[in-house]
């Protein structure tokens, strides 16, 4: 009876979690971040080469600056416009997930609405060669320009909210038949679709322009600043108040994986967008020669590199234990097939083939080991024992190399990741033995 109640609770938990993960706006957000991730990885590689590799060359300051123009150009086209790109991707993904027949129009609306809500006047720092620069005058108010503070990494949260609002409103208005322009049956579909959304698009952007004007005239501010102050900064602060919020979400997410539903259903729709923003901030800071602050030590890369070794639940350690110490032929067979994908952090064969799903002994280290590593790695970073993550690297990068790249080639991070593997093997081993004994008893009863 107790077992049935426990399973019933897990089933209900999985059902609720699946509904949360499949919520259309959260799913669209997850899809958009998945699409933009290669751009962030390219930016991370450029940041590493620009700030770690190029300075090793025997060049004077001018020569190094010329060489670093390459990486700066990549930063300009990736990190510095990432909010604009993300806004468009969210608009497109939301349209696809809502099965709207003109997703490109939604992309246009999202980008336009986002730019409309930006400040029309920005403060720019004067260059060292500017004739206007004096001891008292170091900046100037500029109109007709966009600030990378809004178009880049700092504007990601504004892009998310404005894109979701504008596209949701646009899709709603587009459903009103009276607002569609009928051109007749002989008109090509592409032309007809563009005219169908013309009036809804005009109305939508007019509403956002009115809101921007009212905020500027009546309050002397803009929506991007309000979102950053009231929503983005507090949420980032919660993520960096300690590892506890991240640990809680990944505990729930890995519990979900234990009943057969992918952990990204929860983590991908909740904390990962915020954690991704934090590592993107770190890349921009490092590219500018700045120092990573403690409130950015917790980010997506610290989770990927140090808490997902071999994939969710750090299952690479289980595979190594099985190959070295197991006497169960079925487990050995699965491990031999899964070890190569596991080295590249792909572990679905382990989750469903070993299996982890509904295997109570293995569920315990699967859930708790990543939590342990998140907490310890965060503590080591705060203590200055390992460097903070400054680059987003491909999640399929093998262990040790992964940690070295993420921290700007800090050898201590690579050593710590190797130690994690040893710790993980020690933690998994007794639970693997218990699981094998349980399987042996079940097989004996079946006979």
Can you say where each PLM-predicted feature lies in the sequence?
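Membrane-embedded translocation segments of transport machinery
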Residues: 212-218, 222-326
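Transmembrane alpha-helical segments in integral membrane proteins
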Residues: 82-97, 163-173, 252-259, 265, ...
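Hydrophobic alpha-helical transmembrane segments
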Residues: 73-86, 151-158, 239-259, 294-313, ...
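Juxtamembrane interface elements at the cytosolic ends of transmembrane helices
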Residues: 3-12, 165-186, 210-227, 266-267, ...
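Early transmembrane hairpin of solute transport permeases
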Residues: 18, 22-180, 357
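Core transmembrane alpha-helical segments of multi-pass membrane transporters/permeases
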Residues: 24, 28-49, 157-160, 164-168, ...
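Transmembrane alpha-helical segments and their short flanking loops
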Residues: 2-20, 59-68, 130, 139-140, ...
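Cytosolic juxtamembrane amphipathic/interface segments immediately preceding
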Residues: 10-33, 67-68, 183-195, 349-351
């Amino acid at each position: 009876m107790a077992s049935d109640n426990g399973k019933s609770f897990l089933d209900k938990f999985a059902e609720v979690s699946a509904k949360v993960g499949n919520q259309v706006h959260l799913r669209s957000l997850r899809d958009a971040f998945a699409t933009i991730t290669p751009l962030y990885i390219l930016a991370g590689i450029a940041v590493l080469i620009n700030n770690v590799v190029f300075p090793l060359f025997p060049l004077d300051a001018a020569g190094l600056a010329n060489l670093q123009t390459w990486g700066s150009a990549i930063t300009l086209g990736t990190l510095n416009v990432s909010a604009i790109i993300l806004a468009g991707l969210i608009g497109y993904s939301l349209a696809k997930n809502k099965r709207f027949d003109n997703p490109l129009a939604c992309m246009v609306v999202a980008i336009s609405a986002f730019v409309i809500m930006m400040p029309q006047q920005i403060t720019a720092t004067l260059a060292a060669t500017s004739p206007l620069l004096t001891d008292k005058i170091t900046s100037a108010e500029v109109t007709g320009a966009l600030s990378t503070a809004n178009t880049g990494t700092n504007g990601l949260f504004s892009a998310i909210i404005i894109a979701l609002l504008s596209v949701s409103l646009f899709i709603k208005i587009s459903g009103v038949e009276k607002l569609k322009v009928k051109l007749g049956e002989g008109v090509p579909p592409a032309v007809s679709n563009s005219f169908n959304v013309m009036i809804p698009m005009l109305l939508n952007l007019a509403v956002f322009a009115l809101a921007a004007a009212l905020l500027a005239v009546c309050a002397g501010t803009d929506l991007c600043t309000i979102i950053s102050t009231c929503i983005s900064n507090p949420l980032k602060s919660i993520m960096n108040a300690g590892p506890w919020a991240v640990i809680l979400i990944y505990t729930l997410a890995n519990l979900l994986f234990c009943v057969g539903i992918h952990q990204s259903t929860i983590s991908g729709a909740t904390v990962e967008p915020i954690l991704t923003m934090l590592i993107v901030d770190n890349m921009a800071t490092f590219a500018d020669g700045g120092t990573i602050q403690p409130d950015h030590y917790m980010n997506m890369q610290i989770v990927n590199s140090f808490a997902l070794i071999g994939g969710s639940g750090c299952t690479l350690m289980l595979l190594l234990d099985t190959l070295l110490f197991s006497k169960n032929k079925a487990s050995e067979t699965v491990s031999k097939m899964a070890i190569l994908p596991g080295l590249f952090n792909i572990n679905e064969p382990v989750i469903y083939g070993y299996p982890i799903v509904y295997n109570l002994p293995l569920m315990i280290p699967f859930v708790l080991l990543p939590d342990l590593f998140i907490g310890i790695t965060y503590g080591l970073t705060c203590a200055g024992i390992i460097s903070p993550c400054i680059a987003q690297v491909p999640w399929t990068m093998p262990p040790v190399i992964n940690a070295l790249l993420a921290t700007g080639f800090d050898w201590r991070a690579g050593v710590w990741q190797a130690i994690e593997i040893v710790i993980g093997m020690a933690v998994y081993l007794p639970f693997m033995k218990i699981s094998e004994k349980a399987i042996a008893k079940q097989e004996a009863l079946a006979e």
